[in-house]
Amino acid sequence: MNQLLNNYTTLALINKATGDALRLEILRALASDAFGVMELCQIFDYRQSGMSHHLKVLAEAGLVSKRREGNSIFYSRMLPSKASPLFLLQQQLYRTLDQIPLPEQRVANVQQVKAERAALSQQFFASQGDGYREQQDLIAAFDIYGASVDQLLMNSPLPSLSHAAEVGPGDGEFLPFLSAKFQEVTALDNSATMLGQAKHYCEKAALSNIAFSCNDTQFFTQHPQHFDCVVMNMVLHHTPSPADIFNDIAAGLKDKGVLIISELCRHDQDWARTACGDLWLGFDAEELEQWAQNAGLSSGQSQYIA
């Protein structure tokens, strides 16, 4: 009886939350991205107190969840539980919302927020020299995950061994593994400083089949279905919109192409923001799987390293 009443209460809260046009727009904006309160205020040109109220109503209805990233709280769309009798209602709500585009100005504001995040990341890496590796090693040294990524690569069925790419190669430590396996390799980074370090590393190793591109992942949309494999080692937590990264890379992969990601599990080490330039404090496996699925990719092998 209590559960039945709870279901009616939740249904009433959902109806209340979705009975406001702005709250529906907020849910639409949170389709694949997470935003902080101030970012949502910027996107919707709305006062903070009012935005906080709308987010509270959506949270009470179980339509948004929040996660703490250091001193900041980010909101994202809450996925419906398949065990809930309201699963179909919530699923259909999201499907309907996602068929309705946000107004052009809202879209422009979203892109501005992402551009500001990207600028912070680029400023950090532009200021980095050899000291970056020392900081990065404090949280995720290449020696910890490099061999595991190579093993995943060796075990992955690939369309061919023609073209591979690494997004954010750091100082280039994984590029020799790709160079030995593929005919052509692209090292992609939107930081000229970091790309220069990777290039210097490869020159010292006399690797001749690697091209270096100072670009973001929109590069893949300009080279559709070109790559057999794309690798991202400890990069996603530096990106302004992880969902966009998946979409971009999916466009550049050949049919049955492989995307290999090594990433941090969600953690609470806030010092990584200032020391390592992290925008996100790791991710849950379910988040990665959802972004991959939304981009038209399917999950493959997984491995967890302590």
Where are the language model's segments positioned?
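C-terminal alpha-helical "lid/dimerization" subdomain adjacent to the S-adenosyl-L-methionine
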Residues: V258-A306
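N-terminal helix-turn-helix DNA-binding core of bacterial DNA-binding proteins
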Residues: N6-G50, I73-P80
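Amphipathic alpha-helical dimerization/coiled-coil segments
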Residues: N2-Q3, K82-G131
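A short acidic, Gly/Pro-enriched loop at the edge of an enzyme's catalytic core
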Residues: Q218-V230
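A short SAM/SAH-binding and catalytic strip from SAM-dependent methyltransferases
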Residues: C229-S241
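Conserved alpha-helix/loop element of class I SAM-dependent methyltransferases that forms part
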Residues: A140-L161
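Class I SAM-dependent methyltransferase SAM/SAH-binding core
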Residues: A165, G170-F219
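A short glycine-rich, Lys/Arg-flanked "PGG" loop and its adjoining helix->strand segment in the class I
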Residues: A243-V258
